[in-house]
Amino acid sequence: GNVTSTSSITFTYILMANNAGEYTIPGASIVADGDQMVSNSVKIKVLPQDQGGNSGQNNSSSGSIHSSSGTSVSNQDLFIMASASKTNVYEQEAFVLTYKIYTRESNLQLNNAKLPDFKGFHSQEIEMTTNARWTPEHYQGRNYYTTVYRQFVLFPQQSGKLYIDPAQFQMTIGKPVQSDDPFDAFFNGGSNVIEIKKNISTPKIAINVNPLPTGKPADFSGGVGEFNISSSINSKELKTNDAITIKLVISGTGNLKLISNPEIKFPDDFEVYDPKVDNQVRLTREGLTGNKIIEYLAIPRHAGTYKIPGVSFSYFDIRSKSYKTLKTEDYVVNVEKGAGNAEQV
């Protein structure tokens, strides 16, 4: 049979960054058998020099991440930060609460976490990937490995000074310690790993919630954000006892799920059913983005020509910090007498 052979040559380069920043190392290129081939490029992030290392460390390791020695873990080597994207908001204005782990320890495990109940807020959690992604970060002169533990979008439900209470975490850290036992030195390289239990608490966060301005429109929906509204009707020509459907679509970003349904004033002669609501939204840092679809179903019982007035939709525009009112079109429907008893339900 055919025999093939392959060979490879590896080139290794050792680089040292002169300055902090994000860099892209372009792909290397070679020409083999007349064809040019290019390898992939590599992106790297270089942190500033660590100011929290041990004095015994030399300059070559000053950019790496090291925990302090000993049998304890300091609050500077491991902590969890709770941060709000905004601390001065309006009622119902969305903001993001992030819990982020900062560590200089390489071996840690989260045993238990107790988060506050977010009293005074409506909360929705942002979905995270199942596996934590640790990234290096320079914070207050020291280098850490960090990961986002959990994130929530919060909507304050009342004005005044509200507080996000501390979250409580219980963690276990595996820390290597040197042993003076000659047997340990021979069999284990002179080091053992001890487990250290550590309780961590995040600070309380104050959120200043401003009331919505005075002068709310009579038809204020409770919406806070940026929205549009549109309407459609299934038919303007129908017979008695046929269903008529008007669909309203409120689109935009904000507290979409918390917006009250606009009222359609159907003629008194129509039998009106409860509206059907479909929230097609996704969670973003600004709130819920997408569409709130409301379908209104009514049945005319008598023939005639009827006017269905458009709806008025008022909300608080977070960008202009003012109330805005949007209106949909009126509909005129022609109802003819259908077969059978028009009075039948």
Placement of each model-derived feature along the sequence:
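Surface-exposed interaction/ligand-binding surfaces
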Residues: 1-345
